A protein has these predicted regions:
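Mg2+/Mn2+-dependent nuclease catalytic core
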Residues: 97-188
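A non-catalytic, helix-rich entry segment at domain boundaries
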Residues: 8-102
Length: 188
């Protein structure tokens, strides 16, 4: 389920909407659903081709759609735009969300070439535009922590941040965040 959500968020961030009218609404909800359905089917095929005992849970699609909507809500928050129902989002508003996205599914590699990772999203930090700050966002589709991040997740975020620091200008501020789409929470 997580991979389908991740890939759908990336697809929507990279969606070419240049041929649409800026005032058009009613498209994002159906587009999000169609994108997730496509990615859901891809994951189902991969799951079926992999030898394992559990069964695919088709009934989890609505949970995945909620997760996708949660991740989109966090993107709206980071773009400093009011969270709207997806059906009322205009093309112009989604372009503003897309404008903060610097990269999706970016491969990270240390200068020595021995350490690697893959970030989900790299976005502009609009809270600190003066310093041209960036946020390394790792989408989390599992259960969010009750109080603070687990040591493993915290270490993963710091690892991604440190790998990314090797690839940006020295003066550029950078932080890593875990985005839990389940309850739309963000952890640093």
């Amino acid at each position: 389920m997580g991979t389908a959500i991740h890939n759908s968020v990336e697809d929507l961030c990279n969606l070419d909407i240049s041929d649409r009218d800026d005032d058009e609404t009613g498209w994002l909800h159906s587009c999000s659903r169609e994108t997730l359905e496509k990615r859901w089917e891809e994951e189902k095929i991969l799951f079926s081709e992999t030898p394992r005992h559990p069964r695919w849970k088709d009934e989890s699609f609505s949970t995945a759609l909620d997760g996708l909507i949660g991740a989109i809500s966090i993107l709206f928050d980071k773009a400093m735009l009011p969270v709207e129902g997806l059906s009322s989002v205009s093309v112009k508003t989604w372009k503003q969300v897309q404008d903060i996205v610097v990269a999706t599914e970016e491969r990270l590699e240390s200068q020595c070439g021995r350490l690697m990772g893959r970030l989900d999203l790299l976005i502009k930090d609009l809270e600190d535009e003066v310093n041209d700050s960036l946020i390394v966002a790792d989408l989390k589709t599992g259960k969010p922590p009750e109080e603070e991040l687990s040591e493993n997740v915290s270490r993963q975020l710091l690892f991604y941040r440190d790998l990314m620091k090797q690839n940006v200008a020295e003066e550029q501020a950078l932080r890593a965040e875990g985005w839990y789409s389940y309850n739309k929470s963000v952890y640093r």
